[in-house]
């Protein structure tokens, strides 16, 4: 078995990187519903996002000079990123956290492929008792869940990597109304997504993180700003 020609023929740096480093037998299970419906644009977007965030993670790992770490992926969905990290960093412990994983999904992936990936079925709002992690990652965090990812990172981790998705929260609207500097900055930006990301960076700073922002134009999505932070 190999990747479909619609993916193999796509000449893109991140897609080629992904294919070289991730076996199709695992990929075909994780992405089975999308492959069956031939949702190739969606699949390519997901692959590119995984590589974009993986590159940030890899740089942070290189700075720490160790490949032995604990990583939580919050709201992991199909957990493609978690599996990619588990495959490429076999000394790591990777935990995918989401509301529900099917028994078939868990048994197929845990027993057949990697022994360093684990699953927790829990609402992110109910997470109160995790062991400390080195990294917390979330891709596609929607609305106020992006704030909650930062809160959980502040509580349980030294680093976080976040790719926000849907925009807005009550705190964001209040912050825009009451923050004079933000209003001046926002008047110069005609992109609500970037405004939202700027707010989230400021929110993370208030939780004692040193923040970096990276726009990754190689990710096949308009929601391509990666926020990553280290606890001060």
Language model features with spans:
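Class I S-adenosyl-L-methionine
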Residues: 1-232
